[in-house]
C-alpha cells in the first residue's frame, strides 16, 4: 500500500496513469482483507483469508450480543450506548464485506470500463484531469483512513482514561472488570483486532464514493467533448466524416458509462440501503449518549465517530446528486452543439443520442429510493426522531435508576 503514496499528487503527463489507479489504495486494503482480486493467493494467504472472513463476518458481529447477555447488568448507560452504536455498525460492516466477497468480480469489471473510458482521453488537458482525479480520490480515501484510525485511537485512550475497555467485545477467559492487568490485555487485544476490522471498513465504506467520483470525472470530460463538437474553433467541423466519428466516440463513451453503472449498481444497492437504515439508528443513539450521558472526554471520541458515520453516506450522496445534474448538462451541451449545420446522418444520430442523454445515470438503494442528498437528509431526520422518542420516554432517568 505504501508504494502507492505517489498517487496522492497528480502525476506528470509523461508518467502512465489510469483511472483504475484512483482505487489502488482501496483495492490493496481489500486484498489484505482476504479478497483474492488477482487470483494469486498461496497457502499462507488462503489461511489468512479464512481467519479474516471468519472474524469480520462471524466473530466480531456476534461478540457484542454475547457480551450483552453475559454482562448486561454491569453496563453503565453511556458504555451501553457506546457499545450498541458500534454493534450496529459491525453488523452493517459484515453485510458490506460479504457483498464485496460475492461481487468481487464486478469491481474488476468496473475497472475494465474505466480502461475503456481512458482510451477516449487523448488530449493533454483530458489526461491532466484524469491525473487530478486520481490524486483527489486518493486523498479522499486517505481521509477515511485518518478519521477511522483517529476514532480507534481516541476510543482506546478514552477507555484507558476511564479504566475500561474501548469496544466491549466478548473475549472468553478474559474479564476486564476483575483487575487492571486483564483490562490492559483486553484493551490492546481489542485495539488490534477491532482495529483490523476498522482498517478493512475503510475500503468497504469508501468503495462506492471512489467509483462514483471517478465516473463523474469522465462525465465532465464527455461534456467537454460534446461542447467541442459545436465549437467554432473545432478544426474538423467542416469535415463530415471527422465530425461523425467524434460524435460516435462520444456515444461509445456514454455507453461505456452506462455499462459501468450496470456493473457497480448491484454492489452499491444493497449495502447502501443497509447503511442508510443503520446510519439513522446509530446517529440517534449517538445523540442520546452525547446529550444525556457522555462526559467531556468521551464526547471527543463520539464526535470523531460521527465524522466516520457521516463519511459512509454523505460523500456518496453528494456525488450521486452531482451526476444527475451533470447528465442534464450533457443533454443541454449536445442540443447546443450546432448539430443542425451537419449532414442528415449526423442529425439523426444526434437526435437518438439526445434521447439517451435525457435519462440520467442514477443509483438506487434496493430500487426503493434514489441515492441523493435528499435521502441523506431524511436519514438525519430519522436520527432526530430516535432522540425525540428517547427523550419522551425519560430514558436518562430510567437508565440512571437502573444503574
Curated annotation (Swiss-Prot):
InterPro entries: 7tm6_olfct_rcpt (IPR004117). It is a multi-pass membrane protein. The keyword Transmembrane helix applies. Residues 1-49, 105-139, 215-271, 321-372 are cytoplasmic. One of its GO terms (cellular component) is membrane. GO terms for molecular function: ionotropic olfactory receptor activity; odorant binding; olfactory receptor activity. Interacts with Orco. Complexes exist early in the endomembrane system in olfactory sensory neurons (OSNs), coupling these complexes to the conserved ciliary trafficking pathway. The chain crosses the membrane at residues 50-70, 84-104, 140-160, 194-214, 272-292, 300-320, 373-393. Its main location: membrane. Expressed in 16 olfactory receptor neurons in a broad area across the antenna, including both anterior and posterior faces and in the maxillary palp. This expression pattern matches the distribution of the small sensilla basiconica. Expression in the antenna is observed late in antennal development at 93 hours APF. It holds the Pfam family 7tm_6. Residues 71-83, 161-193, 293-299, 394-403 are extracellular. It is found in: Cell membrane. The atypical heteromeric and topological design of the odorant receptors appears to be an insect-specific solution for odor recognition, making the OR/Orco complex an attractive target for the development of highly selective insect repellents to disrupt olfactory-mediated host-seeking behaviors of insect disease vectors. Odor-evoked OR currents are independent of known G-protein-coupled second messenger pathways. This is Odorant receptor 43b. Belongs to the insect chemoreceptor superfamily. Heteromeric odorant receptor channel (TC 1.A.69) family. Or2a subfamily. Odorant receptor which mediates acceptance or avoidance behavior, depending on its substrates. The odorant receptor repertoire encodes a large collection of odor stimuli that vary widely in identity, intensity, and duration. May form a complex with Orco to form odorant-sensing units, providing sensitive and prolonged odorant signaling and calcium permeability. Keywords: Cell membrane, Membrane, Olfaction, Receptor, Sensory transduction, Transducer, Transmembrane, Transmembrane helix. One of its GO terms (biological process) is sensory perception of smell.
Amino acid at each position: 500500500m505504501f508504494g502507492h503514496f505517489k498517487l496522492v499528487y497528480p502525476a506528470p503527463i509523461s508518467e502512465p496513469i489510469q483511472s483504475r489507479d484512483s482505487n489502488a489504495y482501496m483495492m490493496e486494503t481489500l486484498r489484505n482483507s482476504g479478497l483474492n482480486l488477482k487470483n494469486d493467493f498461496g497457502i499462507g494467504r488462503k489461511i489468512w483469508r479464512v481467519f479474516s472472513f471468519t472474524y469480520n463476518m462471524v466473530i466480531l458481529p456476534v461478540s457484542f450480543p454475547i457480551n450483552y447477555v453475559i454482562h448486561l447488568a454491569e453496563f453503565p448507560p453511556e458504555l451501553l450506548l457506546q457499545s450498541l452504536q458500534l454493534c450496529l455498525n459491525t453488523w452493517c460492516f459484515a453485510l458490506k464485506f460479504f457483498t464485496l466477497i460475492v461481487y468481487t468480480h464486478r469491481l474488476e469489471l468496473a475497472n475494465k470500463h474505466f480502461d475503456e473510458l481512458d482510451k477516449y482521453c487523448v488530449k493533454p488537458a483530458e489526461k491532466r484531469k484524469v491525473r487530478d482525479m486520481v490524486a483527489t480520490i486518493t486523498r479522499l480515501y486517505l481521509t477515511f483512513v485518518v478519521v477511522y484510525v483517529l476514532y480507534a485511537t481516541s476510543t482506546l485512550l478514552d477507555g484507558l482514561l476511564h479504566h475500561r475497555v474501548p469496544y466491549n467485545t466478548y473475549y472468553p477467559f478474559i474479564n476486564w472488570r476483575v483487575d487492571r492487568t486483564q483490562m490492559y490485555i483486553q484493551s490492546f487485544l481489542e485495539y488490534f483486532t477491532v482495529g483490523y476490522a476498522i482498517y478493512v471498513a475503510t475500503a468497504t465504506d469508501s468503495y462506492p464514493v471512489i467509483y462514483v467520483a471517478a465516473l463523474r470525472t469522465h462525465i465532465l470530460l464527455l461534456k467537454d467533448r460534446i461542447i467541442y463538437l459545436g465549437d467554432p474553433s473545432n478544426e474538423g467541423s467542416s469535415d463530415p466524416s471527422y465530425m461523425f466519428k467524434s460524435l460516435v466516440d462520444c456515444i461509445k463513451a456514454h455507453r461505456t458509462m452506462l455499462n459501468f453503472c450496470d456493473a457497480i449498481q448491484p454492489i452499491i444497492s444493497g449495502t447502501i440501503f443497509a447503511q442508510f437504515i443503520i446510519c439513522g439508528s446509530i446517529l440517534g443513539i449517538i445523540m442520546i449518549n452525547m446529550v444525556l450521558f457522555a462526559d467531556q472526554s468521551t464526547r471527543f471520541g463520539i464526535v470523531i465517530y460521527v465524522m466516520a458515520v457521516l463519511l459512509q453516506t454523505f460523500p456518496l450522496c453528494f456525488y450521486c446528486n452531482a451526476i444527475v445534474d451533470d447528465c442534464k448538462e450533457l443533454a443541454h451541451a449536445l442540443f447546443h452543439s450546432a448539430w443542425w449545420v451537419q449532414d442528415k446522418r449526423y442529425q439523426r444520430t444526434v437526435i437518438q443520442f439526445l434521447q439517451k442523454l435525457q435519462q440520467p445515470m442514477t443509483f438506487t438503494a434496493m430500487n426503493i429510493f434514489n441515492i441523493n442528498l435528499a435521502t441523506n437528509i431524511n436519514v438525519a431526520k430519522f436520527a432526530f426522531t430516535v432522540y425525540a422518542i428517547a427523550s419522551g420516554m425519560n430514558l436518562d432517568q430510567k437508565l440512571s435508576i437502573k444503574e
